[in-house]
């Protein structure tokens, strides 16, 4: 359920914002257009939003500024503390993509950025199936995350990272569960969603799935 990576991200908590805003050369392409990616997720979201992987609260802040009601889920205690320091009074609960407390009101959108790859493909499909039962017709899943058009593209990106000496990025790509667009499309359509995929940079795709 992605919690096996908690130690890594708790160590990254203090420097995460520095990385996403381009100060870590290895991850510069991963976070290229970061503000645009977050803003696009906000634009495509409804009024009551369940957010997975709040992290330091960058997306959450934008959702709140857009007058959305946000219920955040974040498994890392240090990340939750950083987000609360940044945002003030906001609901951020301990949980993950598969095990989480439900909000006390219906929500129309589930969002996440840079986090769904913490799940294996089997767990991703389990999560999407669960969200299908929770969303009403017309409800949305709006995710932005690293994925690849096929396995060859994935392998090529690992080779490129190694060639550039980007050891951390290469290890990241091999350690976590980065999947392909065809695999994600199958998961969403199997569970009653229509889905579109839009490339946002060399790594990240925007996924907008609508419950039918």
Swiss-Prot record:
Protein name, as recorded: Uncharacterized methyltransferase Aflv_0758
Single GO term (MF): S-adenosylmethionine-dependent methyltransferase activity
Domain of life: Bacteria
TM stretches of this protein: none
S-S bonds: none
Pfam families linked: Methyltransf_25
Function noted in UniProt: Could be a S-adenosyl-L-methionine-dependent methyltransferase.
Record organism: Anoxybacillus flavithermus (strain DSM 21510 / WK1)
E.C. no: 2.1.1.-
One GO term of the biological process aspect: methylation
Keywords (A to Z) from UniProt: Methyltransferase, S-adenosyl-L-methionine, Transferase
Record-linked InterPro entries: Methyltransf_25 (IPR041698), SAM-dependent_MTases_sf (IPR029063), Uncharacterised_MeTfrase_YrrT (IPR023553)
Protein residues bound to S-adenosyl-L-methionine: 53, 74, 96
Family: Belongs to the methyltransferase superfamily. YrrT family.
